[in-house]
């Protein structure tokens, strides 16, 4: 495995700490007036999702984690899970529902997802940052709603995601949604 020095730490770098894969979320280089310089990093565990802070003396090195990403298309979902396919090799991968809990509301057939693999095993599935989804259910906008200060209303998309949309959005319309926050971005014109 490749080792990286503290001078090579950067946000997004995948490292192995205590045998577990982590991604660096924040890296602060600290040079105190007295004593040795050090790096204080905030890292997120890929397996548990827990965020911790670690400190490394300047010049120390740690192993990089064997974490890689693979782009795959969602073919279909069934009672077992979701089946993804690599567009280049046509290799198919079944991911069980227990690994899809965080993205279940964003699963849409024929969409490209990022599968995060650690030592060859899928540890998470990441949806695209922005998705175009159809509004399946929402209350009609009532005239005068904006006068009372109410400009958003709840809506359910065709994937089952519950989001807040502006009152002018109606059922059947396509909207752009940020999957990181679950928020409405814009109306999509066809």
Swiss-Prot record:
This protein's GO CC annotations: cytoplasm
Pfam families according to UniProt: EFP, EFP_N, Elong-fact-P_C
Protein keywords: Cytoplasm, Elongation factor, Protein biosynthesis
InterPro entries (alphabetical): Elong-fact-P_C (IPR015365), NA-bd_OB-fold (IPR012340), Rib_uL2_dom2 (IPR014722), Transl_elong_fac_P/YeiP (IPR020599), Transl_elong_KOW-like (IPR013185), Transl_elong_P/YeiP_cen (IPR001059), Transl_elong_P/YeiP_CS (IPR013852), Transl_elongation_fac_P (IPR011768)
Gene3D superfamilies with a match to the protein in the record: 2.30.30.30, Nucleic acid-binding proteins (2.40.50.140)
Superkingdom field: Bacteria
Record function comment: Involved in peptide bond synthesis. Stimulates efficient translation and peptide-bond synthesis on native or reconstituted 70S ribosomes in vitro. Probably functions indirectly by altering the affinity of the ribosome for aminoacyl-tRNA, thus increasing their reactivity as acceptors for peptidyl transferase.
Similarity field: Belongs to the elongation factor P family.
The protein's name in its UniProt record: Elongation factor P 2
Organism from which the protein derives: Chlamydia trachomatis serovar D (strain ATCC VR-885 / DSM 19411 / UW-3/Cx)
Lineage: Bacteria, Pseudomonadati, Chlamydiota, Chlamydiia, Chlamydiales
Gene coding for it: efp2
């Amino acid at each position: 495995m490749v080792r990286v020095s503290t001078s090579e730490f950067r946000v997004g770098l995948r490292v192995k700490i205590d045998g577990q894969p982590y991604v660096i979320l924040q890296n602060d280089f600290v040079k105190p007036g007295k004593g040795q310089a050090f790096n204080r990093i905030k890292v997120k565990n890929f397996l548990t999702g827990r965020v911790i802070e670690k400190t490394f003396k300047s010049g120390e090195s740690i192993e990089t984690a064997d974490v890689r990403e693979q782009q795959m298309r969602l073919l279909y979902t069934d009672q077992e899970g979701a089946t993804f396919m690599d567009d280049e090799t046509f290799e198919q991968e079944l991911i069980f529902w227990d690994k899809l809990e965080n993205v279940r509301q964003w699963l849409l057939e024929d969409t490209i997802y990022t599968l995060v693999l650690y030592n060859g095993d899928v540890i998470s599935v990441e949806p695209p940052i922005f998705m175009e989804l159809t509004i399946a259910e929402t209350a009609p906008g009532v005239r005068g709603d904006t006068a009372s200060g109410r400009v958003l209303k709840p809506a359910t998309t065709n994937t089952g995601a519950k989001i807040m949309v502006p009152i002018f959005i109606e059922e059947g319309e396509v909207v752009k949604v940020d999957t990181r926050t679950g928020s409405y971005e814009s109306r999509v014109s066809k």
